[in-house]
């Protein structure tokens, strides 16, 4: 009744080994090849971007003496997810060094994500060639920006979203197969590592079930299902109502992704263009009697429209400013995964077929373009930052020196805009240096946008750092007295009167007197 079979899903049967593995070894090898290709195209940066939010929670469990100050800005996320605990468990059980464990975890997250796409493709097409076209297209586009959401399909480093992503795709497959217990288990795992992203998948799975239930009835099903989904989306809003404070308002100004009315025109296109594309997919699938593609496409149209309406609702009235942290347009993450998987399947069926030159004509330029985009995004860093290798980036070099040569309880002052400095490549200080720091406008403001009680502390400290570019020795002594700061990281040429035991061409690490 619940779809819990003795055989289980493909991933479970593969892991069991034996004859099942023998029957699927070609699939496994192909998925491994695509995983390696995805790594080569999109790169790997363990300590970049949102790793600054997620990895300090792992490091805090491994070394409780770390981060005597500012831990609330990453602990607010860490306390809502099992990601730090699962990562520590993974490292300890396998006796892996920290960086090696992160790298292996990232590679496996790509593999399981592509495996999930492969399983879902089986519901869309019976032909292996077209299925591989779909999976390959997704693999080539892993770091494609999802409209204006500040998300990629899959990030270039291990984080909860990557784990949630493959679990959510597995869940959608189970719903299509009416294996609801398996779907529930996958969604439970996804929720345990990321409390927000799976909520969109849950709503989509409910939508799939509801649309099938209404199928064949006289009533117009889409408005009924859409209204039901909208109500489900708005249920948690009551707990979040409350006027935003001035400090909170300042924090969310750094996160235009939360407010669709601030998006650029091409980001709006990333919301509206899929509607036409998915409707077209549904018409093609109907003619071919590809039932799953038709169901997914029509459901995604309703799904997109409902969340688009919710995003507009939360963006227009100022009184709803604090509710924008629900980020309805993050629903596009699942939509993009499914849309590009189906697009690849249709390309494989109608365009690529068995013509090798057509496959090369599509995937070679596409892969080179995605590779070039990543090099432009991380120009001062190695494309794949392998574990335990010396960093190429001067900022990462300075952060690594700090980790090895400064007291674990040291508190550092940094430019609150340091992650936006050209050549810094969005390397996180906390996660790379494993030291406390003053607040920033990139990641700590993100924590504030999700957890409003942090706003006053963040804003007060940010005000104390105002005018950083013109700071002199007296200014550093002032913030030392106020916040216990004992070190600072400065761009060259630095500030006169400070002792700086480490310097490179871009950065100085200075001890405050």
Language-model features, listed with the residues they occupy:
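Start-transfer (signal-anchor) and selected internal transmembrane alpha helices
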Residues: 1-37
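Active-site lumenal/periplasmic loops and adjacent helix-entry segments of GT-C-fold
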Residues: 34-114, 120-138, 145-164, 192-199
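Transmembrane catalytic cores of multi-pass membrane glycosyltransferases
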Residues: 39-52, 62-80, 195-201, 210-336
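Membrane-interface transmembrane helices that cradle and orient dolichyl/undecaprenyl
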Residues: 163-182, 214-215
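Membrane-interface alpha helices of multi-pass inner-membrane proteins
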Residues: 172-174, 181-195, 201-206, 228-232
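Hydrophobic/aromatic-rich transmembrane helices and adjacent perimembrane loops
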Residues: 322-350, 359-362
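Signature aromatic-anchored transmembrane alpha helix within multi-pass, membrane-resident enzymes
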Residues: 349-378
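Extracytoplasmic
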Residues: 377-513
């Amino acid at each position: 009744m619940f779809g819990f079979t003795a055989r289980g899903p493909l991933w479970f049967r593969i892991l069991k080994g034996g004859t099942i593995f023998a029957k699927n070894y070609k699939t496994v090898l192909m998925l491994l090849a695509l995983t390696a290709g995805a790594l080569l195209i999109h790169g790997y940066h363990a300590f970049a971007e949102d790793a600054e939010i997620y990895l300090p929670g792992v490091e805090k469990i491994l070394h409780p003496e770390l981060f005597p100050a500012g831990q609330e800005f990453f602990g607010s996320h860490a306390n809502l997810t099992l990601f730090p605990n699962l990562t520590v468990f993974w490292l300890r059980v396998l006796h892996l060094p920290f960086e090696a464990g992160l790298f292996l975890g990232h590679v496996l997250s790509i593999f399981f994500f592509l495996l999930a796409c492969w399983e879902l493709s089986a519901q869309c097409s019976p032909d292996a060639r077209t299925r591989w076209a779909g999976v390959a297209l997704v693999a080539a586009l892993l770091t494609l920006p999802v409209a204006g959401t500040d998300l990629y399909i899959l990030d270039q480093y291990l984080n909860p979203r990557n784990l949630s992503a493959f679990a959510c795709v597995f869940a959608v497959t189970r719903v299509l197969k009416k294996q609801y217990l398996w779907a529930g288990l996958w969604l439970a795992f996804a929720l345990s590592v990321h409390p927000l992203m799976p909520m969109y998948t849950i709503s989509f799975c409910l939508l799939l079930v509801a649309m099938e239930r209404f199928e064949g009835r006289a009533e117009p099903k889409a408005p009924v299902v859409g209204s039901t989904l909208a109500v489900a989306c708005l249920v948690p809003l009551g707990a979040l109502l409350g006027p935003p404070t001035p400090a909170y308002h300042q924090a969310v100004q750094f996160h235009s992704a939360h407010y669709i009315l601030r998006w650029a025109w091409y980001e709006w296109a990333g919301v509206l263009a899929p509607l036409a594309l998915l409707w077209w997919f549904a018409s093609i699938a109907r003619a071919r009697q590809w039932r799953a593609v038709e169901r997914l496409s029509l459901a995604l149209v309703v799904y997109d429209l409902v969340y688009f309406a919710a995003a507009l609702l939360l963006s227009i009235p100022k009184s709803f400013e604090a509710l924008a942290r629900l980020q309805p347009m993050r629903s596009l993450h699942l939509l993009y995964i499914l849309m590009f998987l189906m697009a690849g399947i249709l390309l494989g069926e109608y365009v690529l077929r068995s013509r090798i030159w057509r496959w090369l004509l599509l995937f070679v330029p596409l892969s080179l373009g995605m590779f070039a985009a990543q090099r432009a995004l991380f120009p001062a860093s190695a494309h794949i930052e392998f574990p335990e290798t010396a960093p190429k980036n001067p900022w990462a070099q300075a952060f690594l020196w700090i980790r090895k040569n400064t007291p674990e309880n040291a508190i550092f002052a940094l430019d609150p805009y340091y992650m936006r400095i050209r050549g810094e490549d969005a390397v996180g200080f906390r996660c790379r240096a494993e030291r406390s720091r003053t607040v920033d406008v990139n990641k700590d403001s993100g924590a504030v946008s999700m957890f409003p009680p942090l706003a006053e502390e963040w804003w007060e400290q940010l005000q104390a750092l105002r005018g950083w570019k013109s700071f002199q020795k007296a200014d550093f002594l002032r913030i030392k007295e106020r916040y216990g700061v004992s070190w600072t990281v400065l761009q060259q040429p630095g500030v006169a009167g400070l002792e700086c035991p480490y310097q490179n061409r871009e950065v100085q690490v200075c001890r405050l007197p």
